[in-house]
Amino acid sequence: EVQLQQSGPELVKPGASVKMSCKASGYTFTDYYMKWVKQSHGKSLEWIGDINPNNGGTSYNQKFKGKATLTVDKSSSTAYMQLNSLTSEDSAVYYCARDYDWYFDVWGAGTTVTVSS
């Protein structure tokens, strides 16, 4: 069974950073790009960026450049996203999703990030 297992919820203070994970199983990790998506309360999904697990190449939504950093660890079939300089606007659910030619065919359950002092 193809699965993406995301790390648990995070409660962080303004100005801090957070790094979440997305562990893939049931398929060859390097064969598919990994996308990251933000779901803010009451708002539509926003594409953050994607990463090619084969070579680590990344592409970012301009809005999230400098905010998000995407990396992978091929040895553990895990993708990571670090968010920096957090503010209340970054409070959201963040999803990883496997990309099949811009069709997101497998999704993680999401990681909830709450930014609060």
Swiss-Prot record:
Residue stretches in coiled coil: none
Extra facts: The sequence of the light chain of this IgM myeloma protein has also been determined.
Disulphide connectivity of cysteines: C22-C96
CDD domains in the record: IgV_H
One biological process term in Gene Ontology: immunoglobulin mediated immune response
InterPro entries documented for this protein: Ig-like_dom, Ig-like_dom_sf, Ig-like_fold, Ig_sub, Ig_V-set, IgHV
Entry protein name: Ig heavy chain V region MOPC 104E
UniProt keywords, alphabetically: Adaptive immunity, Disulfide bond, Glycoprotein, Immunity, Immunoglobulin
Organism: Mus musculus
